[in-house]
Amino acid sequence: MKKTLLFVLCCLVITTVGYSQRFVSLFNGKDLSGWEIHGTEKWYVDNGELIAESGPDKQYGYLTTKKPYKNFILTLEFKQEANGNSGVFIRSTVEGTKVSGWQVEIAPPDLFTGGIYESYGRGWLIKPKPEDEKALKYGEWNKMKIEVNGNEVTSWLNGKQMVHLKDEKIGKGEGGIALQIHAGGGIKVRWKNLRIKELK
């Protein structure tokens, strides 16, 4: 009986560990289930891709996960069309079109894609080296990876590590993941294959 119970417990532990190490999709390719729109900018699905596009108000817009995420690895692909000024926010909250949190930048060439910016706070916390910014394929599909664990954040672009930051304030942050469309109009960004693995 004891051996049977021990075997069952071991199976449960193995199953739990395996589940915690799995990537899951944040975007189903059909609609915006699991997400919430903030602002009047356009967020829609086209041919299995998530589209962010400037609206008539030309203001900031955000698409946030309804679920908060603390420690995780996030992978995604993005393609910048027109002015591709955007970003991925971590441990963030949004009220109206004002976001509180930290952004992993997505921008046109030589404007610090992969760097980390604190909105309505300290501003740029870290920028990538100029030579590393050459990893951006503007107008093409790019692969981004973001790891957030405790007070550490690391970003990669097309396999190239862009920045690594340790920050106590980020470590205390709480909130969800948000995609941004920048104010000013004329912006369009495509997203696909948004996947996340939660870390303990």
Give the location of each predicted region:
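Sec-dependent N-terminal signal peptides
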Residues: T4-I14
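Carbohydrate-interacting regions of secretory-pathway proteins
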Residues: Y19-K200
